[in-house]
Amino acid sequence: MSRVAKKPVSLPKGVELNVQSELVSVKGPKGTLTLPKPTGVEIAIDGDVATLSANDPSQIAITGTVRAILANMVKGVSEGFERKLELVGVGYRAAMQGKDLSLALGFSHPLVFVAPEGITLSTPTQTEILVQGADKQRVGEVAAKIRGFRPPEPYKGKGVKYAGEVIIRKEAKKA
């Protein structure tokens, strides 16, 4: 079995793991997440610890993946995930209009982004966007979609970038 799959998933207080024949659901203070249960992977719950095992040798590889996804689901419903974006550039601004995000990114019109269900958007400052949610994959997808509106360009670094992202700069053309 893979090294990742051998490691048990600990369930913090307030998190409930429910395994059915076709579905695995994790319920916690931040919401409920579900995962279709792959065939050949067994999930055993012993108190506040869940362990995974493969029934079939061909399913050993997927067991580690399922364990990692399950651990992310447990962390998501207990603590949640967040991704911070920064707007770099003159006149680049973000503001909330109700639950929608309005972005001024140098286009002739403001972009309005509607947050999908389960994702919370906020703007601590005019040049910062905070994407929060219980599902790690959806938080990353939404952050990537917002970043895709105006990815950072390599000459001046203007655009929407992840917090802490290093933009490799190019030198301007010499005359």
Curated annotation (Swiss-Prot):
Keywords: Ribonucleoprotein, Ribosomal protein, RNA-binding, rRNA-binding. SUPFAM superfamilies: Ribosomal protein L6. The keyword Ribosomal protein applies. It comes from the Bacteria. GO terms for cellular component: cytosolic large ribosomal subunit. PANTHER family: 60S/50S RIBOSOMAL PROTEIN L6/L9, LARGE RIBOSOMAL SUBUNIT PROTEIN UL6M. This protein binds to the 23S rRNA, and is important in its secondary structure. It is located near the subunit interface in the base of the L7/L12 stalk, and near the tRNA binding site of the peptidyltransferase center. NCBIfam families: L6_bact. Belongs to the universal ribosomal protein uL6 family. Part of the 50S ribosomal subunit. This is Large ribosomal subunit protein uL6. The lineage of its organism: Bacteria, Pseudomonadati, Pseudomonadota, Gammaproteobacteria, Lysobacterales.
